[in-house]
Amino acid sequence: MKRYNVIFLLDPAGNRLLMCRRRKEPYQGLLNLVGGKIKDGEDHLCAAYRELSEETGIAERDVKLTRLMDFTYYQPDCLLEVYAGQLCRDVPVQGDENDLLWISIDEDFFDANRFAGDGNIGHIQVIAQYRAEHWRLAGTL
């Protein structure tokens, strides 16, 4: 089974989500979360930080990532791990593989004409908002 990760990353204010515009298939031209492949034998959290750094220039010291959820796809036999985090301070981002942009967290991420993943980013947003509210109410944030 192939393994991948994506990172649901908010700016310090929690108002904007970091996305990339895909330059290649699948979902060429659509907005997607940053992420990539998990190497064989690689610690999964380390892989998320590595991909974040490679694709955006954001260092581990700038954000604490938490594994939020997974998607298992039986065709084409892959696992997609979803990590979430919020930058602790403003940092510059730069992407070599894809163009990066910050967009409002209030977008309709279920819009398959704009966003990759056939609605999965919308599901990720709903779960991330629920978890954040739950953690606030529990006093763990």
Regions found by a protein language model. Give the residues of each.
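Short loop segments at secondary-structure junctions
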Residues: 11-15, 23, 86-91, 105-107
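A structural signal for well-ordered alpha-helical scaffolds and beta->alpha junctions
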Residues: 45, 76-77, 120-124
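Conserved N-terminal beta-strand and adjoining loop/helix that marks the start
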Residues: 1-17, 34
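Conserved Nudix-box catalytic region and its N-terminal flanking loop in Nudix hydrolases
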Residues: 16-54
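Active-site segment of metal-dependent pyrophosphate-handling enzymes
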Residues: 57-91
